[in-house]
Amino acid sequence: MYLPQEIIRKKRDNKELTAEEINFFIQGVAKETVSEGQIAAFAMAVYFNEMTMPERIALTCAMRDSGMVIDWSHMNFDGPIVDKHSTGGVGDVTSLMLGPMVAACGGYVPMISGRGLGHTGGTLDKLESIAGYNITPSNDVFGKVTKEAGVAIIGQTGDLAPADKRVYATRDVTATVDNISLITASILSKKLAAGLDSLVMDVKVGSGAFMPTYEASEELAKSIVAVANGAGTKTTALLTDMNQVLASTAGNALEVREAIRFLTGEYRNPRLYEVTMALCAEMLVIANLAKDEQDARAKLQTVLDNGKAAECFGKMVFGLGGPSDIIENYDNHLESAQIIKPVFADTTGFVQAMDTRDLGMAVVGMGGGRRVASDTIDYAVGLSDMIRLGQTADNQQPLAMIHARNEEQWQQAANAVKAAIVISEKQPEATPEVYRKIRPEDV
C-alpha cells in the first residue's frame, strides 16, 4: 500500500519511482482516489526532475492499462495491425491516404485519432466534414470496418486510457504540457491501447511543429521509440518537415478533397507525396509486409495506380456511415465556401520562409479550427493552392486561395497569410521532407 503524497515526495526529491509506485498512482488517477491537486503536484515534480526510461515505460503501460486495451485476436485478421501517429501540423492530411494505402498492401489500420486544437488540424474534424461519417461507432462496427476496408479512422472513446484524459486536463491548466516524459506517455498510452503490432511515429520539425526546435523534436522521437519498444510494440519514428504547409490545402473539407484527389491520381502535391510514401513504406517494412523501403515504395505505387487504395478509402467512408460514392462525387458531399479568391504578396520575390503556425491560426480564425475544445467548426473554410518555399510570388502567382464565408473574413485571412509569409530576393536553400529515421537500435 502506498500513499500518493509519498510517491509525489519521492519524485519531488528526484528519486526514481518503481513500476509498482507508478501503477498505484495511475490506478488512483483512473479511480479518482488521487485528487487533481495531487496530479498537478506529480506532473510538476516530473516536469522539473524528468523520468528515467524505465519510469517512462512504467507510466505509459500504467496509463495504457487504466482502461480497455483492444484485443483483435477474435477478428482473425490475415495481416499485421499497424498504425501511424503524427505530432500534428498544418495541412498534415497524411492519415487519410496512408491508412487506405497500407490497407491495400495487406495491413490492418485501426486508427484512433484526435481533434484539432490550436494551430494543428485534427483528422477527426476532417473526416466529419464528410456528411454522415460517424467517428464514434460501436466496437463491433469499428472491428467490422477495419476487417472489410482494412482501415477505420475513429475517435478516442472514454474507455481507452481514461487516466490520460485526467492527467492531460490537469497538465493543460498547470503549465506542465511541454515535458518529454509526460508527452511520451500521453501519446503512447492511447495508441498502444488500440492493440497494435507496430507503430510509426511522424514527429514534426519546424515553424508549424509541436516541439519548438529540431533538438526537442529529435529528443521526443527517441523517447517515443525507446518507450514504445520497451512496452512491447515495435516502433520507429521519422522526423519530417513542418516549416511550410505540408499539403496544398489547410482546412477540413479542402483537405479531404486533396486526399481523394491524391488517392485517385488527380493531383499529388510533391512534398505531401514524399512524406506519405516515407511513412507508409516504414509501416510496411516494420510490419514485414515489404522486405525493404524500395520494395515497399513499389507496392505502394501499385495500389495508388490500380485504384485499390482509393477503393479502401471509399469502403471505410461508406462503412462508417458516409456516402457510397465519395471517391467519384466528392464535391457533392463536401461543403464549399461562398467566397474563393486569391491573395497576392505585396512585393515580388522568392518565398523565403513561412510561419506555419500562424497560417494554421489563420484557418482557426476563419472558424476552421478550435481555440477552445467546445468551439464548433466551419468545415468549408480554409486555404488552398498554397505557395511553397522557394517559389516566386508575383502578380501571377498568389500566396494562396482563401475560402471564406464573407468578405470581412476573407480580408482578415488575407492579412494573416501575408503576415505569415516572408518574401525575399534570395532563393532559400531547399529543406528535405524527411530529416531522419529513428529505429529501436538508434536509442
Swiss-Prot record:
It comes from the Bacteria. GO terms for cellular component: cytosol. The enzymes which catalyze the reversible phosphorolysis of pyrimidine nucleosides are involved in the degradation of these compounds and in their utilization as carbon and energy sources, or in the rescue of pyrimidine bases for nucleotide synthesis. Belongs to the thymidine/pyrimidine-nucleoside phosphorylase family. It comes from Aliivibrio fischeri (strain ATCC 700601 / ES114) (Vibrio fischeri). Keywords: Glycosyltransferase, Transferase. Pathway: Pyrimidine metabolism; dTMP biosynthesis via salvage pathway; dTMP from thymine: step 1/2. The keyword Transport does not apply. It is an enzyme of class 2 (transferase). SMART domains: PYNP_C. Gene3D superfamilies: Nucleoside phosphorylase/phosphoribosyltransferase catalytic domain (3.40.1030.10), Pyrimidine nucleoside phosphorylase-like, C-terminal domain (3.90.1170.30), Transferase, Pyrimidine Nucleoside Phosphorylase, Chain C (1.20.970.10). GO terms for molecular function: 1,4-alpha-oligoglucan phosphorylase activity; thymidine phosphorylase activity. This is Thymidine phosphorylase.
